[in-house]
């Protein structure tokens, strides 16, 4: 792996010195190997090691290089035609491949090659971008978007119209991460590398970026870029120091309890084989 990452890192530094037409075969092969690893889940842009999230920046660079090395080409889906550099993940898959993967894909859901969906993932008509990792038992509901290189944990529910930010444009240092057993309410947006820690519930219509104040009404503490584990978060406002106006904030109203869990529990019937 160190050799692969070294090739990618060096190629990214030298990217102005070659084109898709004259790219050295070693670089092209390394990029393809990295994308294939992201696609089958053996590689991840970010992973939790000893309780801390570690970002493998070289894999993000591999994704960016793949855009440089591949030309646009027609992509067909029934009567629809597209023109892009990245193939769709499930193009040409057989019934046996879908059964082996254990993923349910509802038309017209789209996942790009280089993204990974683990067993018992359900993709309603949604979009999963390259480099994203969606772990076991998660549902990506209708019109939800999982951005490039985003990391979605086990047994997560991304409700209708949810947006999970990517890293490619505007260029972000770290991916957005939704940890295990989280519930993200309809039309909420989590972006800019924010981490929603395990077991949290985000209400409908909550918008969180790195500069969003996340206010804990019980302790008075303000967090940035991180929703503490087990939080229940709703949209709100905080007053200015002079009391003349208020600005948007995400408010932690309580910790998850049995009542919250009952309202946001996952339905195993929807994930049965």
From Swiss-Prot:
* One of the GO BP terms on file: diaminopimelate biosynthetic process
Q: Which pathway is recorded for this entry?
A: Amino-acid biosynthesis; L-lysine biosynthesis via DAP pathway; LL-2,6-diaminopimelate from (S)-tetrahydrodipicolinate (succinylase route): step 1/3
Record key words, sorted: Acyltransferase, Amino-acid biosynthesis, Cytoplasm, Diaminopimelate biosynthesis, Lysine biosynthesis, Repeat, Transferase
Q: Which reaction does it catalyse?
A: (S)-2,3,4,5-tetrahydrodipicolinate + succinyl-CoA + H2O = (S)-2-succinylamino-6-oxoheptanedioate + CoA
CDD domains given in the database record = LbH_THP_succinylT
Pfam families, per database record: Hexapep_2, THDPS_N_2
InterPro entries the UniProt entry points to: DapD_Trfase_Hexpep_rpt_fam, Hexapep, Hexapep_transf_CS, THP_succinylTrfase_dom1, THP_succinylTrfase_N_sf, Trimer_LpxA-like_sf
Q: Where in the cell is it found?
A: Cytoplasm
Enzyme class comes to: transferase
Q: Does the keyword Transferase feature in the UniProt annotation?
A: yes
Give binding positions for substrate.
Answer: 104, 141
| A single cellular component GO annotation | cytoplasm
Its EC number is 2.3.1.117
Give the signal peptide range.
Answer: none
The Gene Ontology terms for molecular function here are: 2,3,4,5-tetrahydropyridine-2,6-dicarboxylate N-succinyltransferase activity; nucleotidyltransferase activity
The record, for HAMAP family, names: DapD (MF_00811)
- Subunit note: Homotrimer.
- The entry's protein name is 2,3,4,5-tetrahydropyridine-2,6-dicarboxylate N-succinyltransferase
| Organism the protein comes from | Acinetobacter baumannii
State which gene encodes it. Answer: dapD
């Amino acid at each position: 792996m160190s050799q692969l990452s070294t090739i990618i890192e060096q190629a990214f530094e030298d990217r102005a010195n070659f084109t898709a037409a004259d790219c050295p075969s070693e670089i092209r092969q390394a990029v393809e190997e990295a994308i294939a690893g992201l696609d089958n889940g053996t590689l991840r842009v970010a992973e939790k090691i000893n309780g801390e999230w570690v970002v493998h920046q070289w894999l993000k660079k591999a994704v960016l290089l793949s855009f440089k090395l591949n030309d646009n080409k027609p992509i067909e889906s029934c009567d629809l035609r597209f023109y892009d550099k990245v193939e769709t993940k499930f193009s040409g898959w057989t019934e046996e491949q879908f059964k082996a993967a254990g993923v349910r894909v509802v038309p017209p859901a789209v996942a790009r090659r280089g993204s990974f969906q683990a067993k018992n993932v359900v993709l309603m008509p949604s979009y999963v971008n390259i480099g994203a990792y969606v772990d076991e038992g998660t549902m990506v509901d209708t019109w939800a978007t999982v951005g490039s290189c985003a990391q979605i944990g086990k047994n997560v529910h991304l409700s209708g119209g949810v947006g999970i930010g990517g890293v490619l444009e505007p260029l972000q240092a770290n991916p957005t991460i939704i940890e295990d057993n989280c519930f993200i309410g309809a039309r909420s947006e989590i972006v800019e590398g924010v981490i929603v820690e395990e077991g949290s519930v985000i209400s409908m219509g909550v918008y969180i970026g790195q500069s969003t104040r996340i206010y804990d009404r019980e302790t008075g503490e303000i967090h940035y870029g991180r929703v503490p584990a087990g939080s229940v978060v709703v949209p709100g406002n905080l007053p200015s120091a002079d009391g003349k106006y208020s600005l948007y904030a995400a408010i932690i109203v309580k910790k998850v309890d049995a009542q919250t869990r009952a309202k946001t529990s996952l339905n195993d019937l929807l994930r049965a084989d």
